[in-house]
């Protein structure tokens, strides 16, 4: 029953239930009120407008409500937009929440097994123990990591997005390690798997998928470095220099200060990770 936005055409009549991700009121240049909506189902999001809020057939609802919408597809500045004619808030039982979350096209359990295969390939005992403490021995962490997105909107902003992105970056890094023998593969792969772990605390879970207070104040790079540092302290005799190198790779993975990294890459592994991260983010968008 779901049509992706790219499959919709101008003048199509839409009669569907959506999650209202965002609802904002505004005024036209003439001073007339209207509502801007972002509607979501598992295929993605759709911009919508209610040009006559409060009119007959336009019921009251808020952001994060599930709503039944009837309207027509139009075009605005080259993008499809839904002109809403009727809307009502639906009741529980009329919808299944999981149908309204964008989900990775790839098999989530299969991706996680592939990620655990990379964990198993790590030879350095302290790095392997650190990875296993999260990805093998912590069932709650596994559930969260499989479900979470990698971003609010920029890239991999869907259920399984964090896992898909982390695995892809780690695979790029595995390739780099095979091409360039000077790279420490164990350090690079470990950093790749961990690089966006802070997204678990930076972004709230679906359906909100929005920035938390810590996300706004600290950001995922600092949060992730702290998460890894806290766990390192539970592992006996973890080499101090290795811990610093791993944390540096996480801190520097955006590559440049203006892109949000508090440090620029000072290790070849940090540089390789920043390239792998940038490639995967750009290719997904």
Tell where the protein language model's regions lie, with residue ranges.
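Short, acidic/hydrophobic/Gly-rich beta-strand patch recurrent on exposed beta strands
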Residues: 36-41
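Divalent metal-coordination and catalytic microenvironments
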Residues: 18, 64, 169, 250, ...
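Single conserved hydrophobic/aromatic residue that forms the stacking wall/gate
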Residues: 1-6, 10
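A short mid-domain helix/strand-loop element embedded in enzyme catalytic domains
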Residues: 128-172, 194-198
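Short, glycine/small-residue-enriched coil/turn segments at secondary-structure junctions
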Residues: 11-16
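Extended, charge-rich, solvent-exposed interface segments
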Residues: 79-147, 223
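Divalent metal-dependent catalytic cores for phosphoryl transfer on phosphate-bearing substrates
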Residues: 153-155, 164-165, 175-285
């Amino acid at each position: 029953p779901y049509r992706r936005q790219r499959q919709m055409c101008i003048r199509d009549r839409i009669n569907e239930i959506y999650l209202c991700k965002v609802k904002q009121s505004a005024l036209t240049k003439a001073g007339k009120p209207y509502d801007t909506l972002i509607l979501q189902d598992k295929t993605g999001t759709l911009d919508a407008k209610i040009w006559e809020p409060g009119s007959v057939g336009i019921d009251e609802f808020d952001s994060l409500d599930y709503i039944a919408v009837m309207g027509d597809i139009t075009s605005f500045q080259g993008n499809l937009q839904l002109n809403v004619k009727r809307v009502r808030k639906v009741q529980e039982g009329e919808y299944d929440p999981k149908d309204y979350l964008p989900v990775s096209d790839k098999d989530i359990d299969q991706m996680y097994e592939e990620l655990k295969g990379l964990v198993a390939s790590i030879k350095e005992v302290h790095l392997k123990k650190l990875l296993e403490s999260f990805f093998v021995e912590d069932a709650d962490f596994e559930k969260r990591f499989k479900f979470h997105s990698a971003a609010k909107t920029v890239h991999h902003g869907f259920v399984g997005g964090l896992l898909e992105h982390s695995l892809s970056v780690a695979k790029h890094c595995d390739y780099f390690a095979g091409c360039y023998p000077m790279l420490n593969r164990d350090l690079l792969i470990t950093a790749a798997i961990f690089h966006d772990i802070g997204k678990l605390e930076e972004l709230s879970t679906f359906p909100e998928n929005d920035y938390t207070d810590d996300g706004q104040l600290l950001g995922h790079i600092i949060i992730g470095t702290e998460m890894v540092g806290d766990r390192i302290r539970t592992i006996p005799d973890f080499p101090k220099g290795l811990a610093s190198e791993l944390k540096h790779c996480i801190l520097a993975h955006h590559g440049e200060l203006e892109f949000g990294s508090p440090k620029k890459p000072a290790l070849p592994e940090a540089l390789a990770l920043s390239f792998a991260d940038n490639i995967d983010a750009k290719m997904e968008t």
